[in-house]
UniProtKB/Swiss-Prot annotation:
Recorded family membership: Belongs to the UPF0102 family.
InterPro entries: Restrct_endonuc-II-like, tRNA_endonuc-like_dom_sf, UPF0102_YraN-like
SUPFAM superfamilies to which the protein is assigned, alphabetical: Restriction endonuclease-like
Source organism of this protein record: Cereibacter sphaeroides (strain KD131 / KCTC 12085) (Rhodobacter sphaeroides)
Lineage: Bacteria, Pseudomonadati, Pseudomonadota, Alphaproteobacteria, Rhodobacterales
GO molecular-function term, one example from the UniProt record: nucleic acid binding
Name of the molecule in the record: UPF0102 protein RSKD131_0118
Amino acid sequence: MSGEVSYHAGQTAEEAVARIYDRSGRPVAARRWRGLSGEIDLIAREGAEVIFIEVKKSTSHAAAAARLSRRQMDRIYGAASEFLAGEPRGQLTASRFDVALVDALGRVEIIENAFAA
């Protein structure tokens, strides 16, 4: 997949995931939020909790999941820490990391709290 096609496919996947969160009462507060450590695809809120969402698109959900590396997770953690620094409770803000997997047919599988140890 060329860079431009891949970029647009990623945007389409992110939009589909954002709609799911919005419709389930967890409004998306930011898209492609960028900090010094990296970028977070989507940031949603569920009450006082902040949800950091990494969207992965590939031919299958399994292939999409395989594209998430430890290094990428570390960058997301760093960017999330930067985002939380701007919250009233700072690092004490309730938060979680979800991964949204999108397959070639546009089907979405959301893994809540995916980065839990």
